[in-house]
């Protein structure tokens, strides 16, 4: 099952290594990691999306992570009201003969077109994972030439 774990960490060298080492030792599949400084330059907000078999695994992982030096707080926000966003850049094969059709297909997603040339277009979308997967499904038949995803970032609402 997919779980979203957020962590507030001291912004120090090596903390991400120690954090991911715990996940590695428990053989947890990491689907995405995003990290960045917060409103305080001393702190890093990190979002991990992981795949686990059982919910009790997540509880054990969180307990282990909270024991690490330089970890302030770790929480599983999957079942809580939360905001989650991801960015994707997709370069799609778009020769002039089908470009209008492609633009019609992607319009409902409110994508941003960030580059256009004679044979392809590059689009950007911000949304949750489901919205991004839906866009990928729509443009795949036209030919995805390149794609880069940021991974999910999120935090609790309220």
Swiss-Prot record:
<dbReference type="InterPro" id="IPR039557">
    <property type="entry name" value="AHAS_ACT"/>
</dbReference>
<feature type="domain" description="ACT">
    <location>
        <begin position="4"/>
        <end position="79"/>
    </location>
</feature>
<dbReference type="GO" id="GO:1990610">
    <property type="term" value="F:acetolactate synthase regulator activity"/>
</dbReference>
<keyword id="KW-0100">Branched-chain amino acid biosynthesis</keyword>
<dbReference type="InterPro" id="IPR019455">
    <property type="entry name" value="Acetolactate_synth_ssu_C"/>
</dbReference>
<comment type="pathway">
    <text>Amino-acid biosynthesis; L-isoleucine biosynthesis; L-isoleucine from 2-oxobutanoate: step 1/4.</text>
</comment>
<dbReference type="GO" id="GO:0009099">
    <property type="term" value="P:L-valine biosynthetic process"/>
</dbReference>
<dbReference type="Pfam" id="PF10369">
    <property type="entry name" value="ALS_ss_C"/>
</dbReference>
<comment type="pathway">
    <text>Amino-acid biosynthesis; L-valine biosynthesis; L-valine from pyruvate: step 1/4.</text>
</comment>
<dbReference type="GO" id="GO:0003984">
    <property type="term" value="F:acetolactate synthase activity"/>
</dbReference>
<comment type="subunit">
    <text>Dimer of large and small chains.</text>
</comment>
<dbReference type="InterPro" id="IPR054480">
    <property type="entry name" value="AHAS_small-like_ACT"/>
</dbReference>
<dbReference type="InterPro" id="IPR004789">
    <property type="entry name" value="Acetalactate_synth_ssu"/>
</dbReference>
<dbReference type="GO" id="GO:0005829">
    <property type="term" value="C:cytosol"/>
</dbReference>
<comment type="similarity">
    <text>Belongs to the acetolactate synthase small subunit family.</text>
</comment>
<dbReference type="InterPro" id="IPR027271">
    <property type="entry name" value="Acetolactate_synth/TF_NikR_C"/>
</dbReference>
<dbReference type="InterPro" id="IPR045865">
    <property type="entry name" value="ACT-like_dom_sf"/>
</dbReference>
<protein>
    <recommendedName>
        <fullName>Acetolactate synthase small subunit</fullName>
        <ecNumber>2.2.1.6</ecNumber>
    </recommendedName>
</protein>
<dbReference type="InterPro" id="IPR002912">
    <property type="entry name" value="ACT_dom"/>
</dbReference>
<dbReference type="GO" id="GO:0009097">
    <property type="term" value="P:isoleucine biosynthetic process"/>
</dbReference>
<keyword id="KW-0028">Amino-acid biosynthesis</keyword>
<dbReference type="Pfam" id="PF22629">
    <property type="entry name" value="ACT_AHAS_ss"/>
</dbReference>
<keyword id="KW-0808">Transferase</keyword>
């Amino acid at each position: 099952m997919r779980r979203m774990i957020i962590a507030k960490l001291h912004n120090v060298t090596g903390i991400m290594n120690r954090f991911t080492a715990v996940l590695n030792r428990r053989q947890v599949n990491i689907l995405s990691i995003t990290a960045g400084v917060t409103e305080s330059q001393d702190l890093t907000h990190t979002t991990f999306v992981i795949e686990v078999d059982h919910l009790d695994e997540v509880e054990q992982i969180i307990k282990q992570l909270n024991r690490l030096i330089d970890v302030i707080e770790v929480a599983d926000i999957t079942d809580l009201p939360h905001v989650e966003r991801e960015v994707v850049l997709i370069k799609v094969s778009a020769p002039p003969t089908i470009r209008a059709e492609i633009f019609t297909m992607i319009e409902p997603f409110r994508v941003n077109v960030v580059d256009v040339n004679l044979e392809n277009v590059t689009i950007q979308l911000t949304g949750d994972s489901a919205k991004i997967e839906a866009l990928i499904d729509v443009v795949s038949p036209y030919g995805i030439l390149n794609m880069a995803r940021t991974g999910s970032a999120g935090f609790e609402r309220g």
